[in-house]
């Protein structure tokens, strides 16, 4: 599998709604009407055909059902009985007799006819398997496994007369009713079932034993907090999962269910008090109702590629399946919404069956009359197209769902990788690093943006503000204020200082805009930084982009001219700015180019080089220390007892064995235990000097240079190398004047000794952190940083001051 990051690919085939009442499970609705036919025009992908072939004669388990590691605890744990991980709704081993097809890309077909050379998928985790039938047999349920629901039997007996909506993916719906109706042990857990090349993933929700869909809690007075503080981002469920379904938690979850989206204004959003009052006014369901719903399960049918299976299933489960099911659960607890819609859909299907309506006519009626069916259709069409799905369940509940798109990639696609032209090419990570003091250890990953990044709006500022104001809500005023204050040239910290807004609030608002595809977090734009034409830019859109560029900047150089200039020898962006009066306009051009993926920042990286001279000096110093340590003991060099001689002989033999078999490394772990590290050519016992505890790495060559990979996690030997490097720095440094350009002043700046600034810079010489981070994170002048790096060996061009070879200790390279 290639290491290239890929954009969202939901691989969504269908969405299925299963409901179970006291009478038994019911297959309520699925979309699209013909999943295989509607997905037949999809681009071919590397599907899991190899696994299907390898399992053709195997009776192994084809399905997986795993517990959700983030299973919600917002209801009593005593709801679930003993954990019987059998995802069948019957305790006996049930056998389903069903058709099998291999003519489609998914390994399934809408045909109900069978052929003897085709195999069924095995479903052992549900205590079921699909058995072959003759070529003229119809797929129907085995007589030993009937539905819990007593019906007229028409669905089992009238195979040739079965209506088209009573079969999906080549199997009758009564088979799917049992397969997709797990036991109560799967309550609010990740339910996953594999059949052939398809994965069925859901988040089943069961009613409580008292007939309610949530735990009734007494009201608790809590400090009121702003509406947007309760998880409106829609992508942080960590706090919600750890809360009970009390009134306050429901109010908080309402805000998550109805996120303020700058993209899709949602009307009729309820306030928190309204949500609470409507929820408290709902009456508990009658436990004696013979037809009350006891479980519902929204199942997403996926067809992910084999090598990306886990990643694709996880992203759609975390971002769509779980959140949509939570929204339905909340609305079911308030108004019995899900069961009411299920009954309505089933009634429409019964009437259509009596009238012998066509499939298209039936679906037109269902979607026009059922808000839940419309929500499922919207969810399918939007998520399958990697768009944001804005779903309205009722006038009081709306929810926006999406799989967060990939905004950048650090890799260029290889010969066998699918190319995504126009994707931002960069290694810059906008997420707070682990050593950032502003990072919250308890926060979910990928939530906190690094405080030294800036915000680049992906649309016109006026357009975004207009959408935000139209949507309204408590989040609108701070969002509008932040959008007006933000600038791609100012970091979040700088915006906080200028606007007076708290830094965590700015990071939250910026994360909100990034999540809802309205902005992108980038390193702040600066005239001293270097920008080049992105190797991943989409030149097929050059003509269209040139027209848009001309409208935005009619009096400035055209887009082809700007790209041509940036394609030359890399140099600071300030060299392209004609004068100070053009500075703001040229930054707008740079932001426009970055927004479209036309350019990327060329960044510098470096590692510390250890020369053979440094290595030899350290080795001699260590040898000298060992000799001095031995002589300081004041013991006779040879006068030892027989017992001591025996011990020394054993130590010598063991050390010789280590010399031949071990290869010590310069990592911290290899020296942290205090074990002896043998050194070749050490003094023998007859001289009385034993240097077995030397720090020297016997595998390191003294004739070649070495690189220190992690300066902040060095081994003892590497630490001695660094100390020797610093010791050789000159104490006094002359005034230094760097490159002079139109935007750089040639005024000399008094340079400090490198011994003083070395600890500040050293941690960035790991080959991963761009050197452009140093002035931003350390609060230093960029020109001063450039001078220090030039003295240390960073190649930046001709210098007006002769460089000292003792200070040239860096090996630098540049990329995006």
UniProtKB/Swiss-Prot annotation:
Residues 148-159, 225-238, 641-654 have a biased composition (Basic and acidic residues). Residues 44-56, 214-224 have a biased composition (Basic residues). InterPro entries: HTH_NPRL3, Npr3. GO terms for biological process: cellular response to amino acid starvation; meiotic cell cycle; negative regulation of TORC1 signaling; positive regulation of autophagy. Residues 101-127, 268-282 have a biased composition (Polar residues). Keywords: Meiosis, Signal. GO terms for cellular component: GATOR1 complex. Residues 1-23 form the signal peptide. Residues 26-166, 213-249, 262-287, 632-684 are annotated as: Disordered. Residues 82-95, 660-676 have a biased composition (Low complexity). Belongs to the NPR3 family. Mediates inactivation of the TORC1 complex in response to amino acid starvation. Required for meiotic nuclear division. PANTHER family: CGTHBA PROTEIN -14 GENE PROTEIN, GATOR COMPLEX PROTEIN NPRL3. This is Nitrogen permease regulator 3.
């Amino acid at each position: 599998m290639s290491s290239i990051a890929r954009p969202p690919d939901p691989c969504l085939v269908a969405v299925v709604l299963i409901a179970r009442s006291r009478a038994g499970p019911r297959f309520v609705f699925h979309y699209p009407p013909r999943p295989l036919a509607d997905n037949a025009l999809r681009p071919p992908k590397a599907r899991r055909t190899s696994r299907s072939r390898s399992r053709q004669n195997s009776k192994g388990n084809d399905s997986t059902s795993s517990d959700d590691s983030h299973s919600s605890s917002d209801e009593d744990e005593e709801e679930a009985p003993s954990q019987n991980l059998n995802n069948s709704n019957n305790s006996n081993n049930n056998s389903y007799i069903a058709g099998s097809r291999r003519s489609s890309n998914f390994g399934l077909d809408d045909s109900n006819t069978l052929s003897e050379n085709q195999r069924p998928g095995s479903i052992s985790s549900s205590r079921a398997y699909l058995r072959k039938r003759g070529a003229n047999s119809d797929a129907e349920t085995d007589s030993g496994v009937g539905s819990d629901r007593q019906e007229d039997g028409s669905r089992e007996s009238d195979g040739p007369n079965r209506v088209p909506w009573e079969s999906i993916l080549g199997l009758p719906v009564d088979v799917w009713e049992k397969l997709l109706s797990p036991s109560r042990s799967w309550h609010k857990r990740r339910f996953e079932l594999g059949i052939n090349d398809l994965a069925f993933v859901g988040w089943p929700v069961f009613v409580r034993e008292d007939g309610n869909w949530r735990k009734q809690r007494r009201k608790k007075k809590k400090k009121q907090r702003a509406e947007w503080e309760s998880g409106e981002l829609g992508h942080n469920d960590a706090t919600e999962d750890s809360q009970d379904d009390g009134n306050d938690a429901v109010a908080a979850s309402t805000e998550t269910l109805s996120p303020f989206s700058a993209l899709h204004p949602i009307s009729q959003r309820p306030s928190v008090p309204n949500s609470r009052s409507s929820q408290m006014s709902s009456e508990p369901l009658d436990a004696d109702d013979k037809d009350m719903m006891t479980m519902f399960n929204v199942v997403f049918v996926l067809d992910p590629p084999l090598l990306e299976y886990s990643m694709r299933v996880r992203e759609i489960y975390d971002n769509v399946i779980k959140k949509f099911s939570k929204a339905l659960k909340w609305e079911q607890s308030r108004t019995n919404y899900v069961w009411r819609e299920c009954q309505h859909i089933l009634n429409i299907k019964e009437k259509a069956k009596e009238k012998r309506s066509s499939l298209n006519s039936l679906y037109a009626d269902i979607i026009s009359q059922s808000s839940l069916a419309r929500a499922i259709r919207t969810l399918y069409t939007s998520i399958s197209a990697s768009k944001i799905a804005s779903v309205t369940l009722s006038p009081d509940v709306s929810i926006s769902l999406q799989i967060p798109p990939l905004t950048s990639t650090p890799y260029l696609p290889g010969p066998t990788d699918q190319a995504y032209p126009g994707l931002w090419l960069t290694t810059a990570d906008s997420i707070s690093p682990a050593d950032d003091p502003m990072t919250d250890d308890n926060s979910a990953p990928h939530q906190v943006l690094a405080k030294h990044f800036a915000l680049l709006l992906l649309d016109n500022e006026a357009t975004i503000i207009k959408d935000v104001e139209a949507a309204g809500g408590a989040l609108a005023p701070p969002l509008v204020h932040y959008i007006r204050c933000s600038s791609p040239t100012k970091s979040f910290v700088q915006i906080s200082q200028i606007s007076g807004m708290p830094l965590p609030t700015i990071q939250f608002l910026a994360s909100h805009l990034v999540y809802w595809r309205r902005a992108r977090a980038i390193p702040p734009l600066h005239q001293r930084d270097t920008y080049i034409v992105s190797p991943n830019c989409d030149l097929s859109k050059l003509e269209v982009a040139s027209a848009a560029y001309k409208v935005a900047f009619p009096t400035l150089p055209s887009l082809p001219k700007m790209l041509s200039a940036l394609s030359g020898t890399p140099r600071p962006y300030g060299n392209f700015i004609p004068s100070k009066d053009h500075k703001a306009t040229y930054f707008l051009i740079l932001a426009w180019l970055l927004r479209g993926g036309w350019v990327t920042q060329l960044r510098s990286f470096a590692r510390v080089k250890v020369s053979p001279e440094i290595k030899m000096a350290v080795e001699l110093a260590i040898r000298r220390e060992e000799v001095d340590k031995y002589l300081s003991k004041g013991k006779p060099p040879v006068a030892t007892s027989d017992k001591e001689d025996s011990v020394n002989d054993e130590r010598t033999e063991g050390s010789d064995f280590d010399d031949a078999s071990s290869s010590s490394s310069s990592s911290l772990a290899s020296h942290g235990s205090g074990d002896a590290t043998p050194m070749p050519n050490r003094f023998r016992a007859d001289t009385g000097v034993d240097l077995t505890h030397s720090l020297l790495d016997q595998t390191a060559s003294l004739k070649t240079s070495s690189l220190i990979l992690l300066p902040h996690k060095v081994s003892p030997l590497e630490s001695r190398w660094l100390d020797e490097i610093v010791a050789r720095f000159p104490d006094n440094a002359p005034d230094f004047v760097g490159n002079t350009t139109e935007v750089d002043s040639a005024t000399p700046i008094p340079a400090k000794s490198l011994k003083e600034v070395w600890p500040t810079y050293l941690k960035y010489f790991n080959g991963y952190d761009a050197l452009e981070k140093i002035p931003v994170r350390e609060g230093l002048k960029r020109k001063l940083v450039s001078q220090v790096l030039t003295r240390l060996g960073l190649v930046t061009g001709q210098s007006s001051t002769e460089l000292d070879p003792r200070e040239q200790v860096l090996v630098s390279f540049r990329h995006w």
